[in-house]
UniProtKB/Swiss-Prot annotation:
ATP binds at N52, F53, S54, H55, R91. It comes from Leishmania mexicana. Mg(2+) binds at E241, D265. Its EC number is 2.7.1.40. The record marks K239 as: Transition state stabilizer. Pathway: Carbohydrate degradation; glycolysis; pyruvate from D-glyceraldehyde 3-phosphate: step 5/5. It comes from the Eukaryota. This is Pyruvate kinase. Coiled coil: none annotated. Activated by fructose 2,6-bisphosphate, activated by the effector in a non cooperative manner. Its cofactor is Mg(2+); K(+). Pfam families: PK, PK_C.
């Protein structure tokens, strides 16, 4: 049955699924930093706590990390911690008097001459990107203050100065952000501040980095190098925020552990209507590659101050799920909003409704057809296991995986049931929180041999599924595990009847 035919069978009175596949990332800020507030977010549906390093000191973020871990421990769950880097940026200098009133139609000059760094006026002001004149051409636009002020470049006055026309009136203040849409900027992937922040993240044992403004695969390596050998197990999720990142997405996906569709800056760097297309491109490519993908920015923004979302916001969240996003992310809604728990609960309900309208079997077949033949052995086993779910109408899958790789491969093929990953590594439990459909169970197997531990882990996975109401006596459960007694590739699939 096609998705269109499936849509014709839907009813608003149908019950929703008994599990939510899409994961929710919450940005932690003044509204939600306390242990009690964090417990509220977790109970409402948060899987990942995001720290935005564009704001706050290391001491502030240290408190957040400690509180997240305390809240998770008190609730007996594993919550991932993500460090979102500030990234490289371009900014204006300072203005005489603190601001400048820019009038539509006026001529102004922007310069990279440091002599104007603190002497800006409406007629001439500083921008701190030294290669500005090399990458910007007449006819290009310069966006300032999140694109609220737009300048059109007319000519190169000299090697440091551009003549521009002001296209709209706006008052700008000191140190406003600058975007150069359509221009190939050559900023480094890791700023001096980022290097210090990344080392802080390594010391604190964060689970993943949301690396800002990644434009090439080489820059993923720069982030990995900055993390150093102690940070080798930290996931790198690349934020795609301009046209270069979209153009180079295939190689970026290959080098990274996942992708974030960072629609805020992306919607300034490319036309807003193109963001819709970019979102579909990035999510689909991640789906085919089996890499987690996050949809972020302004998803339920009105709930920062209002108790209910707009209908358009509800559709936006649902559309991200329909597109195939593993995670949806909240920013100011939970960092500074008045209704942090309510917004997470709303998002969870929207994701669940959208998931219930999907025909996962269509997705499974589409993904399978797009894979190269011959498949790798592990991919073949995992895709066959998902096929077994559909053929037996199994209610859950149990995957034994220390690294989480097998669980991610299974999730790539979108079974229409929850995936329970049993692992002996706590970090794997947390890092799987950005993979759709996967719930993790930590199993301490130190006192057990491998084969004895294997059966105990399978039993632990089945018991977890029963405790969540995913399976009951008489249901089928598909299990994937390794058998180290067999030579060569030894991942095995078996089908259990739940007792």
């Amino acid at each position: 049955m096609s998705q269109l035919a499936h849509n014709l069978t839907l009813s608003i009175f149908d019950p929703v699924a008994n599990y939510r596949a899409a994961r929710i990332i919450c940005t932690i800020g003044p509204s939600t930093q306390s242990v009690e507030a964090l417990k509220g977010l977790i109970q409402s549906g948060m899987s990942v706590a995001r720290m935005n390093f564009s704001h706050g000191s290391h001491e502030y973020h240290q408190t957040t990390i400690n509180n997240v871990r305390q809240a998770a421990a008190e609730l007996g769950v594993n919550i991932a911690i993500a460090l979102d880097t500030k990234g490289p940026e371009i900014r204006t200098g300072q203005f005489v008097g603190g601001d400048a009133v820019m009038e539509r139609g006026a001529t102004c000059y922007v310069t990279t001459d440091p002599a104007f760094a603190d002497k800006g006026t409406k007629d001439k002001f500083y921008i701190d990107y030294q290669n500005l004149s090399k990458v910007v051409r007449p006819g290009n636009y310069i966006y300032i203050d999140d694109g609220i002020l737009i300048l059109q470049v007319q000519s190169h006055e000299d090697e440091q100065t551009l003549e521009c026309t002001v296209t709209n009136s706006h008052t700008i203040s000191d140190r406003r952000g600058v975007n150069l849409p359509g221009c190939d900027v050559d900023l480094p992937a890791v700023s001096a501040k980022d290097r210090v922040d990344l080392q802080f993240g390594v010391e604190q044992g964060v689970d993943m980095i949301f690396a800002s403004f990644i434009r090439s695969a080489e820059q993923v390596g720069d982030v990995r190098k900055a993390l150093g050998p102690k940070g080798r197990d930290i996931m790198i999720i690349c934020k795609i925020e301009n046209h270069q990142g979209v153009q180079n997405i295939d190689s970026i996906i290959e080098e990274s552990d996942g992708i974030m569709v960072a629609r805020g800056d992306l919607g300034v760097e490319i036309p807003a209507e193109k963001v819709v297309v970019a979102q579909k491109i990035l999510i689909s490519k991640c789906n085919v590659a089996g890499k987690p993908v996050i949809c972020a920015t302004q998803m339920l923004e009105s709930m920062t101050y209002n108790p209910r979302p707009t209908r358009a916001e509800v559709s936006d969240v649902a559309n991200a799920v329909f597109n195939g996003a593993d995670c949806v992310m909240l920013s100011g809604e939970t960092a500074k909003g008045k209704y942090p728990n309510e917004v997470v609960q709303y998002m969870a309900r929207i994701c669940l409704e959208a998931q219930s309208a999907l025909n996962e079997y269509v997705f499974f077949n589409s993904i399978k057809k797009l894979q190269h033949i011959p498949m790798s052995a592990d991919e073949a086993v995992c895709s066959s296991a998902v096929n077994s779910v559909y053929e037996t109408k199994a209610k859950a899958m149990v995957v034994l995986s220390n690294t989480g790789r097998s669980a991610r491969l299974v999730a790539k093929y979108r079974p229409n049931c929850p995936i329970v990953c049993v692992t002996t590594r706590l970090q794997t439990c947390r890092q799987l929180n950005i993979t759709q459909g996967v719930e993790s169970v930590f199993f301490d197997a130190d006192k057990l041999g491998h084969d004895e531990g294997k059966e105990h882990r399978v039993a632990a996975g089945v018991e977890f599924a029963k405790s969540k109401g995913y399976v009951q006596t008489g249901d089928y459960c598909v299990v994937i595990h390794a058998d180290h007694k067999v030579k060569g590739y030894a991942n095995q699939t078996r089908i259990l009847l739940v007792e």
